[in-house]
């Protein structure tokens, strides 16, 4: 058995046939034309009675009614039995009383703002859906959620009005022509809300201004705008100019703010000229120091070259002396060998001693002559005689002959 058959049997707990037919046409068949033809006062009276009395006391499970309900899902009552009976009786009475008070307040609001004026709230379709089949949206023990949903839908002030698509376009076009705005139907931001009249717009204007004030303070929009304005003013008042001096590699910034500051600017430019002159004088003095330093460096180079030449001459003299000493040593060795050989010959030929002596003297004289012709004799002390002096040399020879 489908939901339509079940609804036909018990009418979802709705006691009034008149109310059931209207709610069924709106919810099941989506027939909104019935809202234009019904008696608003009679319809709202029966709807409010069903909302405040029947639904909380007979449809939803509560501890006050001991879980009795005429309409509901069996699986909800079996599965959530603890949720229904698990609370204390005093707490349950307090909760149920509070929920009934909320529903009565909703009923009073709808009666005062719509029933007495023969109007319907603009959320009437959603209210009909909740009251026609509340268990399509909530479980049998969720009465508190049902009450919260009704509060959001019923505590409004806008009246319901049926708008056709043609009427919406005509209204949008008329408002756009009046305000000289091209209204694009595809752009929601440019479309006017049809059910807002002039009175409601005037009431919303202070609220919108308050929102703008809060947003601007929190997000610092005003500070940013003020900073931008200050920057623009500074740019308009101050004209900055940069002058580059290529010779001195100096960048000078000059600021011209007002005519009253011409004297200050003149003094600043004179200061720049004086700084340039001082820098040129410093460059001239530096060049003099550089020339003197170069002259000193040349003299130092000449002295170094002379010292190197003297060192080279000393080294050559030392080499010559060393060579002479070697030659003298070799000559002395030859003389000793010759003398040893002669003495051996003399010992072997003892019979002819006179001849050997003459021969030895002749040989020694020849050797001395040969040695004097080949080498330069070294200097000796005064007792031995000065070989470099011919007189001294003659004395030496005489002494050797004797």
Swiss-Prot record:
GO terms for molecular function: protein phosphatase regulator activity. Residues 345-358 have a biased composition (Low complexity). Residues 278-319 have a biased composition (Acidic residues). It is found in: Nucleus. Residues 266-277 have a biased composition (Polar residues). Keywords: Nucleus. One of its GO terms (biological process) is negative regulation of DNA damage checkpoint. It comes from the Eukaryota. GO terms for cellular component: cytoplasm; nucleus; protein phosphatase 4 complex. Belongs to the PPP4R2 family. Regulatory subunit (R2) of the histone H2A phosphatase complex (HTP-C) consisting of PPH3, PSY2 and PSY4. This is Serine/threonine-protein phosphatase 4 regulatory subunit 2. It comes from Candida glabrata (strain ATCC 2001 / BCRC 20586 / JCM 3761 / NBRC 0622 / NRRL Y-65 / CBS 138).
């Amino acid at each position: 058995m489908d939901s339509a058959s079940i609804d036909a049997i018990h009418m979802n707990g709705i006691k009034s046939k008149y109310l059931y037919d209207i709610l069924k046409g709106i919810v099941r068949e989506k027939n909104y034309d019935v809202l234009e033809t019904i008696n608003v006062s009679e319809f709202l009276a029966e709807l409010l009675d069903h909302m405040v009395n029947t639904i909380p006391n007979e449809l939803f499970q509560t501890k006050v009614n001991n879980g009795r309900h005429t309409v509901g899902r069996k699986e909800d009552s079996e599965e959530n039995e603890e949720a229904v009976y698990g609370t204390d009786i005093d707490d349950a009475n307090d909760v149920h009383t509070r929920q009934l008070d909320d529903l009565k307040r909703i009923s009073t609001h709808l009666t005062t703002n719509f029933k007495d004026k023969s109007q319907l709230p603009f959320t009437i379709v959603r209210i009909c859906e909740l009251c026609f089949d509340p268990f399509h949206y909530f479980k049998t023990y969720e009465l508190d959620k049902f009450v919260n949903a009704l509060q959001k839908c019923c505590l409004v002030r806008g009246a319901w009005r049926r708008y056709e698509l043609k009427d919406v376009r005509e209204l949008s076009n008329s408002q756009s022509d009046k305000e000289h705005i091209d209204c694009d139907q595809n752009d929601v931001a440019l479309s006017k809300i049809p059910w807002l009249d002039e009175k409601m717009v005037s009431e919303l204007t202070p609220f919108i201004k308050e929102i703008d004030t809060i947003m601007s303070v929190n997000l610092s929009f005003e500070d940013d705008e003020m900073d931008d304005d200050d920057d623009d003013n500074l740019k308009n008042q101050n004209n900055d100019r940069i002058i580059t001096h290529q010779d001195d590699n100096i960048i000078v910034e000059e600021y011209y703010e007002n005519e009253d500051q011409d004297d200050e600017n003149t003094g600043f430019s004179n200061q720049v000229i004086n700084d340039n002159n001082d820098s040129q004088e410093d460059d001239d003095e530096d060049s003099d120091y550089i020339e003197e330093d170069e002259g000193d460096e040349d003299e130092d180079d000449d002295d170094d070259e002379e010292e190197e030449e003297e060192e080279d001459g000393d080294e050559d003299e030392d080499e010559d002396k060393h060579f002479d000493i070697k030659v003298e040593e070799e000559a002395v060795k030859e003389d000793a060998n010759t003398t040893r050989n002669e003495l051996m010959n003399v010992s072997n030929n003892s019979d002819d001693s006179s001849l050997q002596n003459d021969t030895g003297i002749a040989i020694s004289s020849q050797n001395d002559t040969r040695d004097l012709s080949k080498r330069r004799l070294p200097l000796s002390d005064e007792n031995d005689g000065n070989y470099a002096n011919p007189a001294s040399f003659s004395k030496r020879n005489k002494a050797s002959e004797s």
